[in-house]
């Protein structure tokens, strides 16, 4: 199949509630949307690059430049028999995994629609529902954090993750344990600490956490291995895992006991499946992370989460936590038992509301005919 046209949009949506990590606080979310048109079909992808280069060196602007100038023209020149061919075709472009993933994942959606099957089935998924966890950002006070967690637990979420940073860590976790007891709980540092903080981080061992996510710098697998030897709590790597090779190296080094998979971070579905399979081979569980995606990207995440080694609840939550209205119909919803139904229609299995997309669009580029 050849792609007739690629549409790229910069869109911005207001968040229902501000979201704060160790990188800072945001009140809205700019991101890129990809729409592929081919043979009377359309398909969608979402680029998870942020406006700022804090989580990743990629930004919405770098992704726009790379997609319009390099990746998009290359994709238009391909005759694609299967979407697994797309990521290798981008090899000449170094890095820029988030830009690559937006196009690659849209190609998977397109192929699933052409085959008349769900994206999850095409990816090799085995589930009809996935377990949903929730990520709670840094709040203005411990009471605000407690109120936020109470709301999420009442909504049925099966696991709570709280963001931490120096000055907002041990006492925040202590409060959660004192008020909510033995709920499934983990923390995410977003690389806010150094190995010199090992003794401080070891204080978290007392709280029976599922894991501590990405405590150290994004490019420091060796120090994560040293830290893991000093902690009882499992380390989960996020920002560090930007390829299947790095995942294998991290496992071999003992740098983590859990891995968070985000397709945007590794370049799309094909490398995500490779990371998933490497982890399964070594008995390392995985879960699906989130990047405050719209319903388009969120639905992609749901489908990938159906693969068998996604054994832990991921950061794939209801649309209403983030965007009202969302860009899809029906929006992503969480059942009272904390699970999300996997869409069964062709491709991502939900309808994209083009009118809402157009209202949110700040910039549009079109490649091809």
Give the positions of each predicted feature.
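Flexible C-terminal active-site loop/helix
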Residues: 1-15, 26, 31, 292-369
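Metal-dependent enolase-superfamily TIM-barrel catalytic cores that perform enediolate-based chemistry
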Residues: 121-231
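Hydrophobic faces of well-ordered beta-strands that scaffold small-molecule active sites
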Residues: 45, 132-136, 160-162, 185-189, ...
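Glycine-rich, aromatic-flanked loop segments that form ligand/cofactor-binding clefts
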Residues: 94, 105-136
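Shared catalytic-loop signature of beta/alpha-barrel
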Residues: 71, 208, 219-236, 241-339
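Conserved, mostly hydrophobic/aromatic
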Residues: 3, 34, 40, 71, ...
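Metal- or metallocofactor-binding catalytic centers and their adjacent structured scaffolds
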Residues: 36-37, 41-114
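Short Gly/Pro-enriched turn/cap motifs at secondary-structure boundaries
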Residues: 22-27, 154
């Amino acid at each position: 199949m050849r792609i007739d046209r690629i549409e790229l949009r910069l869109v911005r949506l207001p968040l229902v509630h501000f979201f704060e990590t160790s990188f800072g606080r945001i009140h809205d979310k700019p991101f890129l949307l990809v729409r592929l048109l081919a043979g009377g079909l359309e398909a969608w992808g979402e680029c998870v690059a942020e406006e700022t280069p804090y989580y990743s060196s990629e930004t919405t602007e770098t992704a726009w430049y790379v997609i319009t100038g390099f990746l998009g023209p290359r994709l238009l020149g391909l005759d694609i028999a299967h979407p697994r061919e797309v990521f290798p075709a981008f090899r000449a472009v170094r890095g820029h995994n988030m830009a690559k993933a937006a196009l690659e994942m849209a190609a998977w959606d397109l192929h699933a629609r052409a085959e008349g099957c769900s994206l999850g089935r095409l990816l090799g998924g085995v589930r009809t529902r996935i377990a949903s966890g929730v990520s709670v950002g840094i709040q203005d006070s411990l009471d605000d954090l407690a109120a936020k967690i109470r709301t999420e637990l009442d909504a049925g979420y099966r696991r709570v993750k709280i963001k931490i940073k120096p000055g907002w860590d041990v006492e925040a976790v202590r409060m959660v344990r004192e008020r909510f007891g033995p709920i499934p709980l983990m923390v995410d540092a977003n690389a806010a600490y150094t190995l010199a903080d090992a003794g401080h981080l070891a204080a978290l061992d007392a709280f029976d956490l599922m894991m501590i996510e990405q405590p150290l710098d994004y490019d420091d697998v060796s120090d994560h291995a040293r830290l893991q030897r000093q902690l009882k709590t499992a380390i989960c790597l996020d920002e560090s895992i930007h390829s299947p090779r790095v995942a294998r190296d991290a496992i071999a080094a003992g740098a983590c006991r859990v891995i968070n998979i985000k397709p945007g971070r590794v370049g799309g579905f094909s490398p995500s499946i490779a990371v998933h399979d490497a982890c399964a081979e070594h008995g390392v569980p995985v879960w699906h992370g989130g990047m405050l995606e719209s319903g388009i990207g969120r639905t992609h995440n749901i489908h990938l989460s159906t693969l068998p080694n996604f054994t832990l609840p991921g950061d794939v939550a209801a649309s209403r936590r983030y965007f009202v209205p969302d860009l899809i119909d029906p929006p992503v919803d969480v059942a009272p038992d904390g699970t999300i139904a996997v869409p069964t229609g062709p491709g991502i299995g939900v309808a994209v509301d083009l009118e809402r997309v157009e209202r949110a669009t700040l910039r549009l580029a079109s490649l091809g005919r």
